Every structure is written in C-alpha cells, then in structure tokens.
C-alpha cells in the first residue's frame, strides 16, 4: 500500500448466512400449505430483499478505491449473553464503521423525534406506517460490540476503549433500495449524518476518515 500502489480492499466472509436461510425457507415452502405457505412466502421476500441490499452495499465498498478491510455478516456475543448480527464492519486506517443495511420498500420520513414513517403506494392509494427505528437497532449493535471489546481487553485497555470507543467506531444505517426517497428535513443533525443511501456510502466514509 505504498506510493502509487492500488488501494487494497479485503473482503472477509463474503458469503452470507442469509442465503442458507433462504434455501431452507424455499425447501419448507414446498412442504407447506395454506396460511403457513403464505407466511413462508413473505419471509422469503424479506430475506431476498435483505440479500439484494447487502449485495448493493458490497458492490459500493468493492469500488471504493480506498484501503479497507470488510467483514460481512458478523455475529458478536458478550459474556452476559447479549448478541448482535452486524451486516458489515468496515475497517479503515482511522475509523471502524458498523454498517446496518436496510433494503426498505417505500419512501421514508424521519421526524424531529427520530421516528421512522414509511409510505407505501398501492396504485393511486398510499399507506403510512411507523417502522422500528434502524437507528435503535444500530445503536444496540454498537453497544454490544463495545462491551465485547472491553471484555476481551485487559483492564487498562478496557478503560481506554470505554472512554474513546466513539472516536474510532462509527455506526451507519445504509438504505440500500435505490428507489427509496428519504425525507429527513426535520430529523436531527446526528441522525441525518448516520442514515444515508447506498450511493452515498463511499463518499461518507471518505469524508469521515478525512476529518477524523
């Protein structure tokens, strides 16, 4: 990675456990009937959307033209039993990014309280509904990783991690559906900075690294 060398992008665990889960669902669907078959079909659609979303993010990272290590689909568990399935951990020279991928259908509005409201269009009608905040999910994963890092360090390093974790670990929520329109006009600044579209991911990473 010296002068004039090509940026190196290392992808670890590029395969996705979701694909194995999807294959099992498809096998179960063939054996099911009635309401159960319909429920499995909905789960298949959600799983397929998640896989496509993560593939979109992986594509962006592979073409980032910067040095990084990408850990894909990582499960972390603390001694106390808290667990977190993190879509991507992106390690750069200065910052480690925790990326939560959301391939949501419909348009997303984020209000001043941080609530997420989704609008889905059905022909000439539209339906609004609140959805679970991906910020909350991302923050929970962030705290689990922080606790796990402290647990696996000696007491001195653990203290340093406790008070400096936020300087080196940054959570991001990436909306991977290119058709999704995000209205964050009334969202707080920190939420606007944390929730981005997939096509903004690389630029956001480069900007945060440059200003760290």
Task: Go through each PLM region and give its residues.
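Cell-envelope/extracellular polymer assembly enzymes that use nucleotide-activated donors
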Residues: 87
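Active-site beta-strand-loop-beta-strand hairpin of nuclease catalytic cores
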Residues: 90-119
């Amino acid at each position: 990675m010296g002068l004039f060398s090509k940026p190196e992008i290392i992808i670890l665990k590029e395969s996705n456990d979701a694909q194995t889960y999807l294959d099992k669902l498809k096998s179960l669907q063939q054996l099911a009937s009635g309401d159960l078959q319909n429920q499995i079909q909905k789960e298949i659609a959600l799983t397929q959307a998640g896989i496509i979303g993560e593939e979109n993010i992986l594509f962006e990272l592979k073409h980032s033209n910067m040095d990084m290590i990408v850990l894909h689909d990582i499960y972390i568990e603390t001694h106390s039993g808290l667990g977190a399935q993190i879509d991507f951990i992106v390690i750069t020279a200065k910052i480690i990014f925790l990326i939560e991928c959301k391939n949501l259908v419909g348009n997303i509005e984020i209000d001043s309280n941080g609530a997420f409201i989704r609008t889905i269009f059905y022909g000439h009608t539209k339906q609004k509904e609140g959805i679970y905040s991906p910020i909350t999910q991302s923050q929970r994963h962030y705290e689990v990783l922080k606790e796990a890092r402290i647990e696996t360090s000696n007491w001195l390093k653990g203290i340093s991690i406790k008070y400096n974790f936020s300087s080196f670990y940054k959570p991001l929520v990436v909306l991977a559906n290119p058709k999704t329109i995000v209205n964050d006009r009334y969202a707080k600044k920190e939420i606007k900075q944390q929730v981005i579209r997939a096509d903004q991911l690389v630029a956001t990473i480069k900007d945060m690294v440059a200003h760290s």
